[in-house]
Amino acid sequence: MRSALALAALLLLLLSPPSLSQEKSPQPGPTPMATSTSTRPAPASAPAPKSSVAASVPAEQNTTPMTTKAPATQSPSASPGSSVENSAPAQGSTTTQQSLSVTTKAEAKDAGGVPTAHVTGSARPVTSGSQVAAQDPAASKAPSNHSITTKPLATEATSQAPRQTTDVGTPGPTAPPVTNSTSPDLLGHATPKPSEGPQLSFPTAAGSLGPVTGSGTGSGTLSTPQGKPATLTPVASSAETQGMPSPMPPSPASPSSSPFPSSPSPSPALQPSGPSAAGTEDTTGRGPTSSSTELASTALHGPSTLSPTSAVRDQRVSCGPPERPTEQLLILNLTRSSPCIHVFQRQSQGEGETEISMHSTDSLPEDKLVTLLCRAAKPTFNPAQDQCHVLLAPMLGSHAVVVKEITIKTNLLPTAVFELLKDRWDDLREEGVSDMQLGDQGPPEETEDRFSLPLIITIVCMASFLLLVAALYGCCHQRLSHRKDQQRLTEELQTVENGYHDNPTLEVMETSAEMQEKKVVNLNGELGDSWIVPLDNLTKDDLDEEEDTHL
């Protein structure tokens, strides 16, 4: 086993030295969110510088190139590319997991005072290569532990940064790239969509990790203790996002935690592919503007006008804007000055702004005029009970005013309203009102009108019946009296015919009447057939003879 390790170390010495480079990127900040992002790797513009790596034991490593879309939180932990010598044996292995995370975080410093870098990627099905170099204090004063490990998404990330696309490549045999898409977890923040960023490429000691394209939530500078400038390979990408992308100003690269000086590497400004999903504050660097950040309030400029109606000191009268005379307006010509005089002042402000101010003088209509207008609208106007409001408007170029509106508000006491409603209780019942109470008083009693109609009908019927009875009695009494008279006359005539009479006066009168009729015919021939004979024409002699003859 030891011989195999020694042979592997010898082979590593013969291989080209690897170099590890990564773009300096801004500190983690708010992560932009995009609904849909498509990325594709582009060929590197320049080869990455190589560095020699010496190991005392051989290492075997089989790697599979992969392309992942995953959030990655990276922080600087070492100087950019430098040579690393490892005297301890190292072993490389390839593992495949269903879900992994790529995270760059700072590890504790080793005994030599050199911090180590830990890079972790996240993808669903992903192949990762691991190479661990053991520390040998005798061989190197500043050994480092560099590993590329695959594991589930780490939860140590405390901030978010613009997503970037990194390309990790090593010389040697390569395999077809594997593309994986992951769902990022932002530790309680809103879940953003993947976006593009710059590509970073670095080779490893043994084998070749194909182009690894990752889309993460953080960025940092990965370097080795004895720095060499890293090569930045831009990536051609096309992103389709929803919403308006917010530009991000370039932010300074994160400082290296290594005590050795590190060479600066070019860091282009990252352009987010979409608005950020959460408004998380970033205290270490500037990131893209979050879509949930409140915009600063700005003063809105525009034409401003005052209310068309300005109330004057008298609450009963208000003045409106001037009116032009028309046939539909009620105009009052005043001998005094108009109660409402408006002065329009136009002032230019800003870009063609116009402000209109309205003023009214102290010349108000007298109380008598207002009272007359209110009494005209309501004859029973009572100033102690009613409130009247008159809206006037001046006429242009004259002292006349326009009466636009007269409003009267009547304040009635509950007792007055109750008395008015008592007279309309029947109408209220028809509308569904069942009861009405004011203190101890209630609705009008129903007994008052309960028997009124039947009583009236009864009285009318009795009066008609009495009239009918009186008419019948009068008719019957008249017929009875007429029968009695007829019967009496009949009896008298019968007695006269039989020669027996009880009333001699009647007989004398009858004989005298007969005689008078004859005499009238004989004596007064000029009268003709007249039955009216004056008594003066009769003589006593005739009467005596008549009496004697009758006896």
UniProtKB/Swiss-Prot annotation:
Q: Where is the composition biased (Low complexity)?
A: 32-59, 91-104, 289-300
Q: State the post-translational modifications.
A: N- and O-linked glycosylated. Sialoglycoprotein.
Tissue distribution is: Glomerular epithelium cell (podocyte) and endothelial cells.
Q: Which of the residues are on side Extracellular?
A: 22-452
Q: Which residues form the signal peptide?
A: 1-21
List the record's Gene Ontology CC terms alphabetically. Answer: apical plasma membrane; cytoplasm; filopodium; lamellipodium; membrane raft; microvillus membrane; plasma membrane; ruffle
Q: Which branch of life, at top level?
A: Eukaryota
One annotated GO biological process? regulation of microvillus assembly
Residue stretches of biased makeup (Polar residues) = 60-90, 142-164, 234-244
**At what positions is Phosphoserine found?**
530
Which sites carry carbohydrate? Answer: 145, 180, 333
Which Pfam family, just one, is annotated for this protein? CD34_antigen
How does the protein's chain sit in the membrane according to the entry? Single-pass type I membrane protein
Give the domain section of the comments.
Answer: Both the O-glycan-rich domain of the extracellular domain and the C-terminus PDZ-binding motif (DTHL) in the cytoplasmic tail harbor an apical sorting signal. The cytoplasmic domain is necessary for the apical membrane targeting and renal tubulogenesis. The large highly anionic extracellular domain allows to maintain open filtration pathways between neighboring podocyte foot processes. The cytoplasmic C-terminus PDZ-binding motif (DTHL) is essential for interaction with NHERF1 and for targeting NHERF1 to the apical cell membrane. The extracellular domain is necessary for microvillus formation.
* Main function: Involved in the regulation of both adhesion and cell morphology and cancer progression. Functions as an anti-adhesive molecule that maintains an open filtration pathway between neighboring foot processes in the podocyte by charge repulsion. Acts as a pro-adhesive molecule, enhancing the adherence of cells to immobilized ligands, increasing the rate of migration and cell-cell contacts in an integrin-dependent manner. Induces the formation of apical actin-dependent microvilli.
What name does the UniProt record give this protein? Podocalyxin
Give the species: Oryctolagus cuniculus
Where is the organism placed in the taxonomic lineage, from the top? Eukaryota, Metazoa, Chordata, Craniata, Vertebrata
